Amino acid sequence: MGFKSFQDGDSLSVATYGRTVAVEKKEETGLANPAPLGLLGFGMTTVLLNIHNAGIIDATSLGMILAMGIFYGGLAQVIAGIMEFKKGNVFGATAFSSYGLFWWSLVGLLLLPKMGYADPVGKGGMAAYFFMWGLFTFCMYISTLKKNRALQTVFFTLFILFFMLMISELSGSEALLHLTGYEGILCGASAIYLAIAEITNEIYGQEVLPIGEIKEVEEARPEYPPGRMPPGPPVRGYRPTAPRFGGEEHPSSPYGGWR
């Protein structure tokens, strides 16, 4: 069998037992990492909303926040979630798609009553809304324990943010809402940092901005010479290969052979 060298997009000629078969080489199309886009959409919109909650900017900025919620916080995260689906990343796909739709739903809760399509949501309804999103975020946070520390910070501070928003709605305390706003700024800033870190580290090919990667410790597996079985219950049908050709073991398997 002979092979001809080829470049991307070329055909590969394979001579097999006197026959020549043309094999089309498909160009692999890779997807860029969508996480920074989703994290920036989430982080920047969260910071702007919570600057308002903290009382740093007044209610005249609400239009800007709604626009960010529709496009960058909402649409950008949904796009990132779809890209994560294509990459087979269930965590990223679920997180980005869900929080993108969260921003759209929040904009809907604010705009639909003003447009006459629904009644304003009461404090109990908003508290239940934030409770469910907090519960979802806590479940997602559990999964981040297998990921990096920076991502854990994003989800933990977001979990705290949702429950502080819930309590703020139930209590009606303006001081607590302002405190919640500052916590939300921290949450959004942590997402922005992680996004910039992922971009920078990928461009430079090394960890320039630390994100606290968790390294899994692999268990050491002892090696066994040919003809010997690893410790454990005997395997039915297994017989160690006898030495051949002047004492050399048969090279078929590092643990011997099946007969």
Q: Language-model features: where?
A:
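N-terminal topogenic module of multi-pass integral membrane proteins
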Residues: 2-80, 84, 239-257
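Membrane-helix exit/interface motif
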Residues: 52, 79-83, 105-119, 136-143
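Structural signature of hydrophobic alpha-helical transmembrane segments
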Residues: 59-72, 120-132, 154-155, 182-185
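Juxtamembrane/interface segments of multi-pass membrane proteins
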Residues: 60, 112-125, 170-179, 205-210
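Hydrophobic/aromatic-rich structural module bridging two neighboring secondary-structure elements via a short loop
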Residues: 78-103
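Membrane-helix interface "capping/anchor" motifs
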Residues: 83-91, 142-153
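Alpha-helical membrane segments in multi-pass integral membrane proteins
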Residues: 128-139, 149-197
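Short, highly charged, low-complexity non-transmembrane loops/tails of multi-pass membrane proteins
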Residues: 204-228
